[in-house]
């Protein structure tokens, strides 16, 4: 990286921005930043020496050698404008991450689903096996208590965000694609083919001896695979595709809070894998981690042992409370495929599943309305709250939670309910709870607060 000593982050409180800021602090850089409010991530950075400003002001960038902004920051932000006027290099978050990732042995994890968990699994295994990686995660690695760290080894593990095409900045040694879905299409002219082509470009940016690690359970991954000109390593958990995959999992058993399987490399049985994070989708995520860690030089036995202690990433089927016989779980699932996978994991518990979903963004709800309406069949009870939308997003006529509930009733769950506010929903759910229930809150907004409210109420 360039030896710019003072880096200022505009919008420092997000997971992606705060992770990069944390790594730079660990590397000895002076870090300042601003955001509209102070949150836990910003407080942790402040405790490590960062100077955090609340609100955006041109004066905040004085003395900075570089300015980093996130996708959510508008072009007319006063700090961005001031930086440009002063001749300070101004770059997108992905460009700063590329500086960290591209100069070392990088592992970039992309895909519509499973990025955070897969990145976390690889980071956890390397940590447990003494490799000491740098990791930059879009969520908190529970075992480390942080979303980022600068390690002493040459390995950098990071999420590669496809949502705005910024993953094209990276030149890693390993690229993982867990899945491809028609999400974030507002950044791709509403055309899914443009997004798929972006993945092909991403996979062409590997280092010359790099490897593309692809989940062939996913039909869209299989579709783009013939266009990949780099070395390809495939993995699968779907019985329809395990015979075609180089790495596979069979004899899968998913229980209340664990999953087990047998792992194979082609026809060779590598051994048994036991995870304390439930769901078949987590076995797929673990397979991707196994492929990378084996290639790095770790033995399967060491990898499996490390994965057996992986407790998960924050907001990824995270158990918030367990009281009065009721399990309260929160998950970041905000896409139909993620909802289906998360509900499948919940269903394996054998409990009555009460699913509470807070849609996020009018654009996503518009593009995926039909898919959302078909995603809730595995739940016993379904409650939909109002759409959570970031500031500045315009409403779309006809795109409401009421409309979504009507479609869910037709396509996957006839008893789906619309309860507008979190407060109303919380009181309703609490009154309906029975011993043996599993309450599952899902969404990318602030629905997680309801999980904590319910857990605290149950413990009183």
Swiss-Prot record:
Pathway: Cell wall biogenesis; peptidoglycan biosynthesis. One of its GO terms (cellular component) is cytoplasm. One of its GO terms (biological process) is peptidoglycan biosynthetic process. This is UDP-N-acetylmuramate--L-alanine ligase. The lineage of its organism: Bacteria, Bacillati, Bacillota, Bacilli, Bacillales. Its main location: cytoplasm. It comes from Brevibacillus brevis (strain 47 / JCM 6285 / NBRC 100599). It comes from the Bacteria. ATP binds at residues 111-117.
